[in-house]
């Protein structure tokens, strides 16, 4: 079972071109299934049945795994069995028809427009780290990139004259996104200093040593910026969420936002309509005269 898991993970990286983060997540989930199989004397993937997989899901849920994590595990199992069936190594899928326990879908955390501008409009020193970090923040918010999409950018993926960036998203799907004026200006300022790092490759964002910046380093730099400018915890995906929410709020074009985010299913994008409704409800409650409660009344 472990040998076939290794082959599947190699397939994900080399043929599906998923990120290392996604590949490792699938590996961890499938290792839980293997551990369960070893515990119950299940020798191979063909022998695993739906009843046993259902029992594993119930056990993990009982021990505190979230519905979202369990849904991801089932997705990993389905992907593995699609691969095994295609390779002629298996003839069924025990995850077929199984679903994770339902859970409350949490709305993504976003910055409102004023807070986003506060983050981006802080003073920037004209040095290597400051210019690089500013360009990273501006590009995240301007184009709604995933963390892996940003760190994988090469110089020839950006056309600043045209205001476009080409990214490789999940499943190796390419898309072209607009880059706003402020982000272009920040990138141009960064390019002027980038050569100081004696770059060893064509990565857009590099360290002082000339190496491509890592996802971990970007998360840290975004966190530092959030604490410095906003006094709050900030992570890269919050900037992507903020981009999506603000574009949808202004345009009301859900399909366009779906394409820009690279979502395969529009239901994933629809979560931002709930954020927009939250904002509208807050405005209504604070502004509409019939929404304000009289003091001392409960009804």
Swiss-Prot record:
Ranges where the Core-binding (CB) domain occurs: 1-85
One GO cellular component term: cytoplasm
InterPro entries xref list: CB, DNA_brk_join_enz, Integrase-like_cat_sf, Integrase_catalytic, Integrase_recombinase_N, Integrase_SAM-like_N, Recomb_XerC, Tyrosine_recombinase_XerC/XerD
Compartments where found: Cytoplasm
Active-site positions on this chain: 146, 170, 237, 240, 263, 272 (o-(3'-phospho-dna)-tyrosine intermediate)
Signal peptide: none
SUPFAM superfamilies in the cross-refs: DNA breaking-rejoining enzymes (SSF56349), lambda integrase-like, N-terminal domain (SSF47823)
Gene3D superfamilies noted in UniProt: 1.10.150.130, Intergrase catalytic core
Matching Pfam families: Phage_int_SAM_1 (PF02899), Phage_integrase (PF00589)
GO biological process: cell division; chromosome segregation; DNA transposition
Family, per entry: Belongs to the 'phage' integrase family. XerC subfamily.
NCBIfam families recorded: PRK00283.1, recomb_XerC
Alphabetical list of HAMAP family matching this protein: Recomb_XerC_XerD
Subunit structure: Forms a cyclic heterotetrameric complex composed of two molecules of XerC and two molecules of XerD.
Name of the protein in question: Tyrosine recombinase XerC
